[in-house]
């Protein structure tokens, strides 16, 4: 079942495009890109979420990430 969001697809796609442009500008390989994005998520959780909620948010994020991964072997 798709998740409802308070953000429009346009808002999400615009921000995603800008972030991808930064990674491409720096010619960041996949492993570096994942490291940077992971550090960004960690920083957002640690600085924007109440300590009592951090673990639950991290678990929810991890589950959402895992459920969005495509098992198609093609890149």
Curated annotation (Swiss-Prot):
It holds the Pfam family DUF1414. SUPFAM superfamilies: YejL-like (SSF158651). InterPro entries: UPF0352, YejL_sf. NCBIfam families: PRK13689.1 (NF010242). Belongs to the UPF0352 family. This is UPF0352 protein YejL.
